[in-house]
Amino acid sequence: MAFNPLLSLLKADAIFLGQLSKSSFCATSRAFSVFYFTRFKRSAYVSAPFGIEPHDEKELKTIDDNVHSNNLSWQKIQEHEVIRELYRKAAYELPGLTPYTQSFKKPADSQIFRFESDVQMSSFEKMNPKVVVTFKVTNIPLLEEKQRHVLRLLVGPRYNPEEDLVRISSDKYSSALQNKYHLIKILTSLIEESKRNAEKFSHVPLNTGHWKYKKCDKRMPQEWLADATTLTSKKKTTIGKQSHNTVLERESIATTDE
């Protein structure tokens, strides 16, 4: 079944009216008396006429905010406005983006370096400027086997020997673009150093101790198991004796009461 945003909008209205009917009538009437509502969103404040009473707009706004800060019906109205705004965007703005759709294309082999950054579109908080670059050492052109070996030595624990991948991250700067340029400088310097020191460090073995899986032997010693079985048998006998004694005490109490 295709998604119909207008039908969803009507359903949201029905759910909202059902929830609003459960709230207190006084709080709801107070909320609607201060604001008036259009078809889609809350509009401007309704100000009192000047001939009736002197008023200050700032003072009235602070009073209304204090009144509605702990009002459940007012919170439901604000939540409903956010939902309606999202449905309006899905109904009227998303169809306008269809000419800009692009089909997925697999990255070409010439794209050696892959940059990644987290962008949260639904959050108003500070964006995460961290950028991560991943690449395969064997895919870098113009490098001999000795130079690739030196490059693996230089990256250290950032090297994955199982997939021949290198993963480097940077959050030094407050902008993701600056961190990307910083990673590009690091990559160029790594390639230059691996070319320059290929003969000097070619005999150094590659240490992959950071990637070794430390298998934990969780088997219990047999001596401990034997002690545990004897201990449990002793506990069983003591518990049986205690339960037998409690039964005898209850029987004696019952006979004395009779």
Curated annotation (Swiss-Prot):
GO biological process: mitochondrial translation
Transit peptide start-stop: 1-39
GO molecular function: structural constituent of ribosome
Principal localisation: mitochondrion
One Pfam assignment: MRP-S28
Keyword set, alphabetical order: Mitochondrion, Ribonucleoprotein, Ribosomal protein, Transit peptide
Subunit structure, as described in the record: Component of the mitochondrial small ribosomal subunit (mt-SSU). Mature yeast 74S mitochondrial ribosomes consist of a small (37S) and a large (54S) subunit. The 37S small subunit contains a 15S ribosomal RNA (15S mt-rRNA) and at least 32 different proteins. The 54S large subunit contains a 21S rRNA (21S mt-rRNA) and at least 45 different proteins.
Name of this chain's protein: Small ribosomal subunit protein mS35
Lineage: Eukaryota, Fungi, Dikarya, Ascomycota, Taphrinomycotina
Gene transcribed to yield this protein: rsm24
